[in-house]
A protein has these predicted regions:
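N-terminal active-site beta-alpha-beta segment that forms phosphate/nucleotide-binding
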Residues: 1-100, 107
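Surface-exposed, charge/polar-rich loops and edge strands
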Residues: 1-5, 12, 107-112, 121-124, ...
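A residue-level signal for conserved active-site and pocket-lining positions in enzyme catalytic cores
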Residues: 10, 45, 69, 113, ...
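Glycine-rich, N-terminal phosphate-binding loop of Rossmann-like dinucleotide-binding domains
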Residues: 47, 116, 177
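Short glycine-rich anion-binding loops that position phosphate/pyrophosphate groups of nucleotides
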Residues: 49-51, 117-121
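Short, well-ordered alpha-helical microsegments
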Residues: 52-55, 133, 158
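Charged helix-capping and loop-helix junction motifs
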Residues: 60, 128-134
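Residues at the C-termini of beta-strands that transition into short coil/loop
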Residues: 73, 86, 102, 152, ...
């Protein structure tokens, strides 16, 4: 299957599964952070959209442990940057219908929680097709160490994803099962 076919198949399954309660294990994510010995406590995340893994409880847990949360915002040049946000802060909806932070405090996160449509055993991912996360990870890795953690349902795992030179491999994938 090509990426477009995989997206179509997974979107359908993800929509059907959306009524079920899937919870991420925040302790597993914290164990990754300890293992990697990340110095800063700045986490780039995403606001759940289009039946993605719900990150809101995870953000609340991380804030209790003094992590700072950042969410992406897309600018007019189709570039993604991350801005501070707290679970108590309001959001604004962009032209794609995605909630974004209002803050103008931009920073590079140390850890990036990445939404995805599908992933494989080699930690390749398929996103929505805009290349936002691939470009962002590529840009940041030149400047500093960043750990990318894909968040997914276990049913989003596929056998093999054909990649191109612009696709950035994740460091980890966390599902509701592990």
């Amino acid at each position: 299957m090509n990426k477009s076919q995989i997206r179509k198949k997974i979107f359908k399954i993800r929509k059907q599964a959306s009524s079920k309660k899937f919870n991420l294990n925040s302790n597993f994510i914290l164990s990754i952070l300890k293992k990697e010995r990340i110095k800063g406590k700045i986490i780039g995340g995403y606001y759940p959209y289009n039946f993605e893994i719900n990150t809101l409880n995870l953000f609340k847990d991380l804030e209790k442990k003094n992590y700072r949360i950042m969410l992406p915002r897309i600018n007019d040049k189709a570039q993604m940057n991350f801005f501070y946000w707290s679970t108590k802060d309001p959001l604004q909806v962009n032209k794609l219908g995605i909630p974004e932070p209002i803050s103008n405090i931009k920073k590079y996160p140390n850890i990036l929680l990445v939404p995805l449509v599908a992933f494989d055993k080699d930690l390749n991912r398929i996103g929505y097709g805009g290349g936002f996360y691939d470009r962002y990870i590529s840009k940041i890795k030149v400047k500093k160490k960043i750990i990318s953690i894909g968040l997914a349902y276990s049913f989003q795992k596929v056998k093999k994803i054909r990649t191109n030179k612009y696709d950035m491999r994740l460091d980890y994938v966390v599902t509701e099962k592990k």
